């Protein structure tokens, strides 16, 4: 089952449902990507920081070799890590990531965080994480404008078909749009019923920037990381509002949460290593929730953010 697409301001079509690669184990990653392609997934959302791009590429290569899919039918996403924000670092690290994936271009290349950290040589440590070689967080003087100018050159050189941002506020987006020669095609943010960020979503969409939600299931992804507010928060899958809608429509709680996003034009990137759930997560566009039901889910908003760099040792708040 193929996912419907959203037209980006770059002119390219992006699947509304993709497969997220954060925390996908290196040992199983190639097989998971391969199986996801067989199940019908075409968008794969990766990143330098996930540390599994080589294995992702192996799964893609196997599927292409077996004739299951062509490269041009895939939508491969990766991200620029914080340690490579200086203008002359952007293209070299993008080329390394392309080589890791075994592809010639990214369909979408995203600035992962609006934070410039001190450069870490990939030969010394890769992925570099948040700390410098000294073992502590150190900042670079690179500006977002410097970084974005280098990102635009990736489009010029056909290394990336579209470029975007992640974890940006409306203020940062507004500033970026004042000087961008190539407008960001997408904004990827944490988005679930406990963190709806309606004004940010509305602003991005009004500016023609597609929104992608990560962590669509709220605290679930952060339990194994022992993030305190995730551990202390009731699971969305067990919330009465979500459960009752799942029963009404004969869907899973996961499908209800994903449909709440996709019905509002927001792309999603769930993952699963379970074949049944893989298929179920793709089936989130052919049926509709009522307007009042969308609003009921949105009313669960608590402003609860689970992916905050403060928890990774960052001492300057970005949200």
Swiss-Prot record:
Gene Ontology biological process: D-xylose catabolic process
Function as written in the Swiss-Prot or TrEMBL entry: Catalyzes the initial reaction in the xylose utilization pathway by reducing D-xylose into xylitol. Xylose is a major component of hemicelluloses such as xylan. Most fungi utilize D-xylose via three enzymatic reactions, xylose reductase (XR), xylitol dehydrogenase (XDH), and xylulokinase, to form xylulose 5-phosphate, which enters pentose phosphate pathway.
Residues reported to bind NAD(+): 166-167, 215-224, 271-281
Active site: 50 (proton donor)
Pfam family for this entry, one: Aldo_ket_red
Pathway the protein contributes to: Carbohydrate metabolism; D-xylose degradation
Domain of life: Eukaryota
Annotated source species: Aspergillus oryzae (strain ATCC 42149 / RIB 40)
GO molecular-function terms, A-Z: D-xylose reductase (NADPH) activity
Name this protein carries in UniProt: Probable NAD(P)H-dependent D-xylose reductase xyl1
């Amino acid at each position: 089952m193929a996912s419907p697409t959203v037209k980006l301001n770059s002119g390219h079509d992006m699947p509304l449902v993709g497969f997220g690669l954060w925390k996908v184990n290196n040992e199983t990653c190639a097989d998971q990507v391969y199986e996801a392609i067989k199940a019908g997934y075409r968008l794969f959302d990766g990143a330098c920081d996930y540390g599994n791009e080589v294995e992702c590429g192996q799964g893609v290569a196997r599927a292409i070799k077996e004739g299951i899919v062509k490269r041009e039918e895939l939508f491969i996403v990766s991200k620029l890590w914080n340690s490579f924000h200086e203008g002359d670092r952007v293209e070299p690290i993008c080329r390394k990531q392309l080589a890791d994936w075994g592809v010639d271009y990214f369909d979408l290349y995203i600035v992962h965080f609006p934070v410039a950290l001190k450069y870490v040589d990939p030969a010394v440590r890769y992925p570099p994480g948040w700390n410098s070689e000294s073992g502590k967080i150190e900042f670079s003087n690179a500006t977002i404008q410097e970084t974005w100018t280098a990102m635009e050159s990736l489009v010029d050189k056909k290394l990336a078909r579209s470029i975007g941002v992640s974890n940006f506020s409306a203020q940062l987006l507004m500033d970026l749009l004042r000087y961008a020669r190539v407008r960001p095609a997408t904004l990827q943010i944490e988005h679930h019923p406990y963190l709806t960020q309606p004004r940010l979503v509305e602003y991005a969409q009004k500016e023609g920037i597609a929104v992608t939600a990560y962590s669509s299931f709220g605290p679930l992804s952060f339990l194994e990381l022992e993030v305190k507010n995730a551990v202390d928060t009731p699971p969305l899958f067990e919330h009465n509002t979500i459960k009752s809608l799942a029963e009404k429509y004969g869907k899973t709680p996961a499908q209800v949460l994903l449909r709440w996003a996709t019905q509002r034009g927001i792309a999603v990137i769930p993952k699963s290593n379970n074949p049944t759930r893989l298929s179920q997560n793709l089936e989130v566009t052919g049926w509709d929730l009522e307007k009042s039901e969308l609003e009921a889910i949105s009313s669960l908003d608590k402003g609860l953010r689970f992916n905050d760099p403060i928890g990774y040792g960052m001492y300057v708040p970005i949200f």
